[in-house]
Amino acid sequence: MQLSEAVRRRIINLTDERNITLHRLSLESGISYSTLSSFINGKSQSPKLVTLLHICEGLGIELNEFFTDNLFKDVEED
């Protein structure tokens, strides 16, 4: 799996687990809804690290916790 797909799936899984909409994540993270939506829908590449940090803050997790999921075990470079 490509890194961008693993990041995308991880965000989707975390928002589903926490019953958080993209709109709510946008408000909590300070990242625009259009930016989040574009990434989740595969219209843009992986977010920059600082953007991912804000997304993690919006989800209430640490950045290192984000990457501990099994999705990242055999990830390939984009």
Model-predicted segments: where are they?
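Short, charged recognition helix plus adjacent turn
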Residues: M1, S38, F67-D78
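A short, Lys/Arg-rich alpha-helix, primarily the initiator
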Residues: M1-I20
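Residues within the helices of the helix-turn-helix
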Residues: I12, H23, L53
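The alpha-helix within a helix-turn-helix
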Residues: T15, S26, C56
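Short alpha-helical DNA-recognition segment
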Residues: I20-S38
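The DNA-recognition helices of helix-turn-helix-type DNA-binding domains
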Residues: S32, K43, N70-D74
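Short, basic-rich loop-to-helix N-cap that marks the start of a DNA-contacting helix
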Residues: K43-H54
